[in-house]
Amino acid sequence: MANTVILVDQPTLEKMKQTYLPFSNPKLPPGAVFAAKKTGVSITGYKSRKVMFQGVNGEVEAKKWVATLPESKTKAPSVSKGILPANFASKNVIGSDEVGTGDFFGPITVCAAYVDAEMMPLLKELGVKDSKAMKDPEICRIAEKIMPLVPHSVLLCPNPKYNELQKRGMNQGQMKALLHNRAIENVLKKLAPVKPEAILIDQFAEKNTYYRYLAKEPSIIREDVFFATKAEGLHLSVAAASIIARYKFVQAFDAMSKEVGIPLPKGAGPHVDAVAAEIIERFGLETLAKYTKQHFANTEKALKMVKK
């Protein structure tokens, strides 16, 4: 079995843990902080910040993450700050980001937003920055202030549609690529005849993989497109897109909670299993499917809780 080991920083390790939650394996080897299994690859992340990829797709999966490959003494293909044009942070850019991919409940939500140099001082004054450390109330407060100022497009993939696409063989990467491409296209149409100097996508797949996912799309945005991990820190457009996406995600979550009559939790941990089991007991499995990503391990865990 082919093994690939990469060394990552702590924020990347946490991001990987969240990304692989839908494929999580509860049995952790000694020293591990997460373990997951996807088609053709098993992934194990360790406290040492080393992540091991085992299987025929191990190397391909590893290359999605910006990190050193110690075993081969080479570097994974890196799409990061280094390849962006000079003074990128001050350019007029469309940025895009997504939320909801690691949450059992709720839709995948993608936002593309345009920020030009003239707008930047005001956005900074309003609190636009990397939103990962922000709580929902702050996210919502800032989003409501910037949405009238920032040309943007938000697209949601509701859970019933997500489940339908997933059963037809589409993975999350494909869904995200479609949503990013369409959201960016929507913003370009709003801006016309003005053109951005660049487009920056918060990277979730290699460039070639991203465009392969879009192969059947009638319109594919390729001109001046860049991909980078941690893109919120590289341009305010991505930070703004992330804030707006999270705001819309929170709104969708609140609406679903009211509809089902139960406060729905974010994430995909044990606390989520308990709420899912309650929904199954009260309303049935079909109702749960309306609000969740069915292929997550939480579905089976909740069913086992109900059967006890």
From Swiss-Prot:
Q: Which cofactor does it need?
A: Mn(2+); Mg(2+)
Tell me which residues make up the RNase H type-2 domain: 91-308
Q: What is its main location?
A: cytoplasm
Provide the alphabetized UniProt keywords: Cytoplasm, Endonuclease, Hydrolase, Magnesium, Metal-binding, Nuclease
Compartments reported by the entry: Cytoplasm
Q: What is its EC number?
A: 3.1.26.4
Cofactor, how bound (note): Manganese or magnesium. Binds 1 divalent metal ion per monomer in the absence of substrate. May bind a second metal ion after substrate binding.
Residues annotated for a divalent metal cation binding in this entry: D97, E98, D202
Q: Does the keyword Metal-binding apply?
A: yes
**One cellular component GO annotation, for this chain's record?**
ribonuclease H2 complex
InterPro entries of this UniProt entry? RNase_HII/HIII, RNase_HII/HIII_dom, RNase_HIII, RNase_HIII_N, RNaseH-like_sf, RNaseH_sf, TBP_dom_sf
Which is one GO molecular function term here?
RNA-DNA hybrid ribonuclease activity
Report the top EC class in one word.
Answer: hydrolase
The reactions it catalyses are:
Endonucleolytic cleavage to 5'-phosphomonoester
Q: Does the keyword Magnesium apply?
A: yes
Show the Gene3D superfamilies listed in the entry. Ribonuclease H-like superfamily/Ribonuclease H, TATA-Binding Protein
Biological process (GO) annotations held by this record are: DNA replication, removal of RNA primer; mismatch repair
* Family membership: Belongs to the RNase HII family. RnhC subfamily.
Which HAMAP family does this entry report, sorted A to Z? RNase_HIII (MF_00053)
> NCBIfam families, from UniProt?
rnhC
UniProt-listed PANTHER family:
RIBONUCLEASE (PTHR10954:SF23), RIBONUCLEASE H2 SUBUNIT A (PTHR10954)
Q: What does this protein do?
A: Endonuclease that specifically degrades the RNA of RNA-DNA hybrids.
Q: Please give the name of this protein.
A: Ribonuclease HIII
Query: What is the primary gene name for this protein?
Result: rnhC
